[in-house]
Amino acid sequence: MRLWMYGLLVLLGVLLMVRRQAPSAYIVLDPGHGGRDPGAVAPDGTREADLNLAQALTLKEYLVALGYRVGFTRTSDVYVPLSERIAMARRMGARLFISVHHDTPTASRPGVYYSPHPGSEELARTVAAALGEGAWVRPSSASRFGRLYIDDFPGPAILVEFGPTRPISRAERIARAQAVASPIAEFARRWTA
């Protein structure tokens, strides 16, 4: 009887120690577009804004499971101005800013834009590698808009184009989240240590 109690106490001690050592970096996920701004729209009516939110919510589950605190710039179909997204992340005390997007319906590959701030390019390359062979990495200045709002975040910031805007199954969304969560968490651990 006493042996199982000893085992239970050891297990509880280990769990408490692991919990105390869990990462505490705050990561803000920014599901792009929303509300009056649908983003790209596929021929079947699939809206990029909806895909972005669903992908960000799924990614959060995996980052939280890895011990990270995660915030959002939006959690429903609302419009949030670009400048407010960065201001929200700053108010939340974010250490990393990850904008979640899907490209035009005709896009052929996923990719990642990165801000000019230290750590951003490394984070972008890490996430692009997790997205698979052929994923591109570009500075934010190379976007068709000339400059991206992620540049206004003072730390590592990326904009991930998870692929074309089209219907996406829950299984595919989960696979994408699983693929990028660990590399993001590993980067956050190193960056915030």
Name the predicted role of every residue range:
Residues A25-G45:
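Short glycine-rich His-centered loop
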Residues R2-G7, G13-Y26, D50-A193:
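Active-site-proximal helix/loop segments of hydrolytic enzymes
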